[in-house]
Amino acid sequence: MNQFESTQSNIFSLRSSDRCNVFGSSSSSPSLLNRWIDIWSTSISDITSILVLAGTKTAEIEGISAAGATKESRRFTAVADAEFLLHGPTASRRWPLPPLSAGVSPALISYVASDLIGVKSLIAQAGILQTPSFPCLSIESPSQGPSECITTGKAMDINRVENLFEEGMKMGLELASPLLLTECVPGGTTTALAVLTGLGITASELISGSSRTPPMTLKKKIVEKGLQSLSLGAKPCPKELLAAVGDPFQPFAVGLLLGARKVKQPVLLGGGSQMLAVLATALASIDSSLKDDFVEDISIGTTYWLANESLSLSIGQSAFQSLIKLVEDSFEVSLLGLSAGLRFTKSSKQVLRDYEIGYVKEGVGAGAFVLLAQNNGVSCKKLIEECEFAVDQLDKI
């Protein structure tokens, strides 16, 4: 079972005076931390926030994901979460949040935090079966559908990967403000594990997912089956790797990240292992001489619960911090990670307290949105109150 513990990270105060944790090799630089605070406060009114929805048939494997209690409900998790992020707990929502074994969708946290600071998100989708009931950018034809299960070793056609990458690059190059990138991809931690493993990063004991008891053995078997028939070599072509064992979010996000950095825009990656897989793939795609400049204004924002999760091989530091260290070592770069200060230990709502015992943990950019709220003067006390109010509203529907 996973557990939360004190980890080797630095405590850092944001503008709300509430504290967050910072980690990664760049966390020891006060100038970088102050630069982060300035970037993500002075421009809060005009940041570009993009939530990418994507689908993979990997999510239909029994027991692989808790982002919906059944494989049928996981098919509409992404559109339900996106609709909640946009509109909150209103009765007019078309897509009900999928039933969970415990907890509540992290979209509730993301909605509360983003609403308090006035950040509106653009929704983009690739590989979603449903037709969204809200404005949504279709990155590709909806007829493409979800990517195949990664056990096939043929998740996507290489042309699809190329097209998604180019669409992301095009959007990134057009950015004129800092980018907050978030995602909702049921089954996405498994595709992230596959991609990181394919890049030579030993991550199978460091990636959990939304379950309280992560199906890590199952994930490992799925990844091994997907990779075993491939002849990718020690340094695989990133796009070929994504075509084999990735999902539609990944090539689009890699292109978007590369494009954003080409035009010198700071990027906050909201999430956990899925964002690290995107970052690692981007690093594998560029010349080594460019890597330090590339990562300079990239940060990874997540929740307390994910950043402090302890798994079997993460002795002395959390699994996520150990994973960041592996990516740093693999590409010889220094990364900056931050985890929000929001805790539900004393919440009056059981579905929120469930986060404290290992359920859900992260998703829909929850940690990043909370960090931005904290950095712009919103207290954790206020966030808890508003999250509890949103739960009450949800219960009335």
Curated annotation (Swiss-Prot):
GO terms for molecular function: nicotinate-nucleotide-dimethylbenzimidazole phosphoribosyltransferase activity. Gene3D superfamilies: 3.40.50.10210. It holds the Pfam family DBI_PRT. It comes from the Bacteria. Transmembrane segments: none annotated. InterPro entries: Nict_dMeBzImd_PRibTrfase, Nict_dMeBzImd_PRibTrfase_arc, Nict_dMeBzImd_PRibTrfase_sf. PANTHER family: PTHR38811, UPF0284 PROTEIN SLL1500. Belongs to the UPF0284 family. This is UPF0284 protein Pro_0435.
